[in-house]
Amino acid sequence: MVLPRLYTATSRAAFKAAKQSAPLLSTSWKRCMASAAQSTPITGKVTAVIGAIVDVHFEQSELPAILNALEIKTPQGKLVLEVAQHLGENTVRTIAMDGTEGLVRGEKVLDTGGPISVPVGRETLGRIINVIGEPIDERGPIKSKLRKPIHADPPSFAEQSTSAEILETGIKVVDLLAPYARGGKIGLFGGAGVGKTVFIQELINNIAKAHGGFSVFTGVGERTREGNDLYREMKETGVINLEGESKVALVFGQMNEPPGARARVALTGLTIAEYFRDEEGQDVLLFIDNIFRFTQAGSEVSALLGRIPSAVGYQPTLATDMGLLQERITTTKKGSVTSVQAVYVPADDLTDPAPATTFAHLDATTVLSRGISELGIYPAVDPLDSKSRLLDAAVVGQEHYDVASKVQETLQTYKSLQDIIAILGMDELSEQDKLTVERARKIQRFLSQPFAVAEVFTGIPGKLVRLKDTVASFKAVLEGKYDNIPEHAFYMVGGIEDVVAKAEKLAAEAN
């Protein structure tokens, strides 16, 4: 450490005289020196490298705290390690956030004095960063002046908002049948090719339009190809604007990265989202794809650290690890972080500890169905399998609850009659059942909706439908006010006025 100019060899006599005549100066100086001593970086050296695990020995008795970030200078830049265990004899065991190839024993390690910190703020919008906050989109450094540690406590009970509020998405099927809680956690179930990516993009777009909020997409164990495709699609649809302000920040911890990076990248994305909530009062949408891979990475890290596994080979701290992430996703009196988490269910076993632990935290589930997508109905949300704890008369109001229940009842009746229709035809049904089937088919098509982000592909302008309009429209259909309108007029429209306009247009074309 370089001492201040005051304390050089030539000025010791002057300093001694000043010290005797001014005790206050001496006290202040001692405090300054003590502070400087405490801020001196702790350095150590690598003693063992075992895959993603690196042991570091420190000469000083003072060791870096658990979760502190350590740095090693490498020819490629820097390698960040996170302290996981204190082994004794001044040695700590760390998890590497990148590959350890080429790392040798004896290399110098520097303690940063705090956890991994990442850039936050509007400068991150439209950019792709990795777990340690470095840009990976080849568009230069992120010019943010603010950085936040990825490890933080959840908001206190006093800060949290206790009222249950709906976060309007503008998507009819979601708002009506499985509404999202503001500051809630939603599980998104969907296989390949059912419109999951487009659904996510539309949510990002609608949150920006309806609430002026931002979104953070976190790829946990994401395939590099999928991440690249998502980035390119977002640029094409205008969600990411390279010239103006974008609506989303992307954080990727790719599938080929070490388990340490995949276990922490969700926290990096959450930290960026928390800044928009706490400092800018925004309603932020946080996407995590895939939450199972977060658990899987934690399991790998746990095994590398030598912990005894629990059921099915998962880490013994599974519930704690999940809770540390999920409890930070909440509503405060300033804003909210609403999370949509893609959930992979291993071998379709819902009792597997990983998805079972996730389900305990979810407020709603949105299920994308291949059967519905094959009918050409998009978004392909299954109205009978999707659920929400907010669909309660005390939260959404009696009218909304009654309409949603009647819609589900009508669709369920139609589903139970489909086998009879397939074998015997519509003629064998009673008049009441025929009417129910006709209305159910209209409702099924009315649950479709043109998306703004898909306009470049479909040529149909996107529609954002307000919740009160959605409830009123479906109530009118259930009451039979539009029984005279053909069912194809209900396909790919916004509100009920669009149905009427489309029906008039179709009638004019027919004449």
From Swiss-Prot:
UniProt entry keywords in alphabetical sequence: ATP synthesis, ATP-binding, CF(1), Hydrogen ion transport, Ion transport, Membrane, Mitochondrion, Mitochondrion inner membrane, Nucleotide-binding, Phosphoprotein, Transit peptide, Translocase, Transport
Gene3D superfamilies with a match to the protein in the record: 2.40.10.170, Bovine Mitochondrial F1-atpase, Atp Synthase Beta Chain, Chain D, domain 3, P-loop containing nucleotide triphosphate hydrolases
GO molecular function list: ATP binding; ATP hydrolysis activity; proton-transporting ATP synthase activity, rotational mechanism; proton-transporting ATPase activity, rotational mechanism
GO cellular component, one term: mitochondrial inner membrane
Pfam families assigned: ATP-synt_ab, ATP-synt_ab_N, ATP-synt_VA_C
The keyword Transmembrane helix belongs to this UniProt entry's keyword annotation: no
Chief localisation class: mitochondrion
Subcellular location: Mitochondrion; Mitochondrion inner membrane
Phosphothreonine: residues carrying this PTM: T112, T237
Entry's EC annotation: 7.1.2.2
Any one GO biological process: proton motive force-driven ATP synthesis
Keyword Ion transport (UniProt): yes
Xref: InterPro entries: AAA+_ATPase, ATP-synt_VA_C, ATP_synth_F1_bsu, ATPase_a/bsu_AS, ATPase_alpha/beta_chains, ATPase_F1/V1/A1_a/bsu_N, ATPase_F1/V1/A1_a/bsu_N_sf, ATPase_F1/V1/A1_a/bsu_nucl-bd
Targeting signal (transit peptide) range: 1-33
Superkingdom of source: Eukaryota
Binding site for ATP: G190, G191, A192, G193, V194, G195, K196, T197
Catalytic activity: ATP + H2O + 4 H(+)(in) = ADP + phosphate + 5 H(+)(out)
Annotated SUPFAM superfamilies: C-terminal domain of alpha and beta subunits of F1 ATP synthase (SSF47917), N-terminal domain of alpha and beta subunits of F1 ATP synthase (SSF50615), P-loop containing nucleoside triphosphate hydrolases (SSF52540)
PTM-bearing positions, type Phosphoserine: S373
Free-text function comment from the UniProt entry: Mitochondrial membrane ATP synthase (F(1)F(0) ATP synthase or Complex V) produces ATP from ADP in the presence of a proton gradient across the membrane which is generated by electron transport complexes of the respiratory chain. F-type ATPases consist of two structural domains, F(1) - containing the extramembraneous catalytic core, and F(0) - containing the membrane proton channel, linked together by a central stalk and a peripheral stalk. During catalysis, ATP synthesis in the catalytic domain of F(1) is coupled via a rotary mechanism of the central stalk subunits to proton translocation.
Subunit structure: F-type ATPases have 2 components, CF(1) - the catalytic core - and CF(0) - the membrane proton channel. CF(1) has five subunits: alpha(3), beta(3), gamma(1), delta(1), epsilon(1). CF(0) has three main subunits: a, b and c.
Note: Present with 164000 molecules/cell in log phase SD medium.
NCBIfam families documented for this protein: atpD
Family membership noted in the UniProt record: Belongs to the ATPase alpha/beta chains family.
Protein name: ATP synthase subunit beta, mitochondrial
Originating species: Saccharomyces cerevisiae (strain ATCC 204508 / S288c)
Gene name tied to this protein: ATP2
